[in-house]
Amino acid sequence: MEDEDCYEDWMSKMPSHMWDIPLWNLAIPGSHDSMTYCLDKQSSVSNSTPRVVQVLDKYFPCIVRPCIMKWATTQEGAISNQLDLGIRFLDLRIAHKIKDPDEVFYFAHGVYSLLTVKEALTEVVRWLDQHIKEVVIIALSNFEGMNLDQHKDLIQFLIATFNKKICPKSVTPSLQECWNHSYQVILSYDDESSTGYVELWPQCPYWWANKSDPNLVISYLEDQKNEGRPSQFFAAGLNLTEDARYVLCHPCQSLQSMTRRSYSLLMKWVKQQRPGSGQACLNIICADFVGIFGSESTQLVIGLNQIEA
């Protein structure tokens, strides 16, 4: 690909012999919990947090919320900046605030976001309009506090917003197929309410180690590879996960400092991976703080497509 330091149009610059490969057999960089760069410092904790945390937040918000922000924030760059870096998989955790009379949807990870779903996805549409040969996989999940009617409202908004850019789930999406039909968005919707919508793909499996030690994360991912990859889209998560004990034992740390310390080890593992249809091949590779060292991590993932297995 030309312009090796610029990845905002990397799909359009892929060599022609890769245009007909299904996207689930390519290496695609993704961001874990993509919208946590805009968490609301003034927000109460989300309803998905443990009950004890909700009680503590009620009486000691000045202590609880800064701590949650340190460990719930997984990204720094705005969604359009992530796309500019080459990210083509967005991990969106949707929520409706409890007792909120307005039918407004937010993102949640410990606390709620400042940006609404409408604002964020409108930004994605604007970006796609300027990069007409790029394809983004958007995985929506969690749906905290949502009932069936709210699911229907959200689904109708998604279809109206992305409209003809949506790639139907009946298609085997390659770059060429998407370009031929002007498809730019693959919507994965992890809820039974999506049944019957040709525009919505099923859940995108996410390999999550739930470990704070990067060596254990790598060990988990290797175990998953040995069991065999899914037949379609799936994501391997490089993200580290703290537990209550880790947070208490490391009061001066944050998720970002933990990620920085583990970055080189995780990237060394990425360099050894290969995309493709084989049992041990990877597809989407997700990371926290995707711009922490510029475009290096996305460059590594995209570069895997140029290596012959």
Curated annotation (Swiss-Prot):
A Pfam family that this protein carries is PI-PLC-X
Protein's UniProt name: PI-PLC X domain-containing protein 1
- Per UniProt, what is the name of the gene that codes for the protein in this document? plcxd1
Q: Which GO terms describe its biological process?
A: lipid metabolic process
In alphabetical order, the GO MF annotations are:
phosphoric diester hydrolase activity
InterPro entries listed in its UniProt record: PI-PLC_domain, PLC-like_Pdiesterase_TIM-brl, PLCXD1/2/3, PLipase_C_PInositol-sp_X_dom
Domain named PI-PLC X-box is located at 17-193
